[in-house]
Amino acid sequence: MKKYIFFFLFSFINFFFVYDVTCTKEVTSTNDDPLTPLNRFDKYYLRMFKKVPRLQQNGSNIINGVNMKNTVIVLYFFAKWCQACTMQSTEMDKLQKYYGKRIYLLKVDLDKNESLARKFSVKSLPTIILLKNKTMLARKDHFVSSNDLIALIKKHL
């Protein structure tokens, strides 16, 4: 009997102290939000292949131009005060050196482009979004090594 009690107690303590248990506030979704309720088991899922908002600089199209068709575009949201972003920036430089002109890397400073970050629902930094043909292919809301990014981009080239 003592063995069963010990096992149950050990399992209970192990669950709360070994596994990362987080609490999140339930948020209602809107049509612009990429997170939508899926079913009663999965609270949210990322709706992939979502059309992206129009990006412009000084009145000219950056992404929606004809020359960007079938080009993989990497949006990298960062901030100068973010320590993980400084590590991610070196990985993004490696990515740019590896692919050269085969991809289009667009670095977006969060402090200067808050409205754009809201359009893409950026909640954490660094955030990396892969786009192709005005469609979101993948999204990473954390640090990602250059090797993982290279493998992810190879799938879509």
Swiss-Prot record:
Which positions make up the signal peptide? 1-23
An example molecular function term from Gene Ontology annotations: protein-disulfide reductase activity
* InterPro entries hit by this protein: Thioredoxin-like_sf, Thioredoxin_domain
Maturation and modification: The disulfide bond between Cys-82 and Cys-85 acts as a redox-active center and is reduced by thioredoxin reductase TRXR.
Q: Which gene encodes it?
A: TRX2
Disulfide cysteine pairs (residue numbers) = 82-85
Return the protein name. Thioredoxin 2
> What's a GO cellular component annotated to this UniProt protein?
mitochondrion
Alphabetized PROSITE patterns for the sequence: THIOREDOXIN_2 (PS51352)
Q: Where does the protein end up?
A: Parasitophorous vacuole membrane
Pfam families per UniProt:
Thioredoxin
User: What binding partners and quaternary form does the record give?
Assistant: Monomer. Component of the Plasmodium translocon of exported proteins (PTEX) complex composed of HSP101, EXP2, PTEX150, PTEX88 and TRX2.
